[in-house]
């Protein structure tokens, strides 16, 4: 009996730590996406085509770092684990599963199959080939970015409601 309580206490501590980590990861990602939408993109829109090309190229280079990957890609591991650990609480399980699905479909897949290919294409250009970057890069990149921002925020809000219910 005592051993069962100890195991349950340890399981609950691990669950609470994991839940906090997931909320932090998803919240930071959603915040980054939102700030990019409401501050960075409007600022970049004021640049000339060449300035925009150079700025996005630099942003795409510096964002690829270990901290970014831990926060942005980390939920690929932590969210399914949290979902599995919440399987005995139906409300928590449903909210966590929904949040996980939204994050994977709306943030990870859109980033992987829409934004990253555009970034890779931009990276391959030299300084003379940037013409029409507004047409083939900026419009579709911002469109998909705004969609992933919505999904990131929705995932974070749903995940956070687990703290209330």
Where are these regions (language model features)?
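Short, Lys/Arg-enriched N-terminal segments with co-localized hydrophobic residues
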Residues: 1-12
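Hydrophobic residues within membrane-embedded alpha-helical segments of Major Facilitator Superfamily
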Residues: 25-28, 78, 102-103, 151, ...
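Interfacial loop at the N-terminal end of multi-pass membrane proteins
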Residues: 16-18, 26-73, 119-139
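Mid-bilayer segments of alpha-helical transmembrane spans in multi-pass integral membrane proteins
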Residues: 104-113
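Core segments of transmembrane alpha-helices
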Residues: 71-82, 148-156
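Membrane-helix exit/interface motif
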Residues: 38-40, 56, 75-89, 114
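Interfacial segments of alpha-helical transmembrane regions
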Residues: 14-27, 91-105
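Juxtamembrane boundary at the C-terminal end of a transmembrane helix
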Residues: 160-165
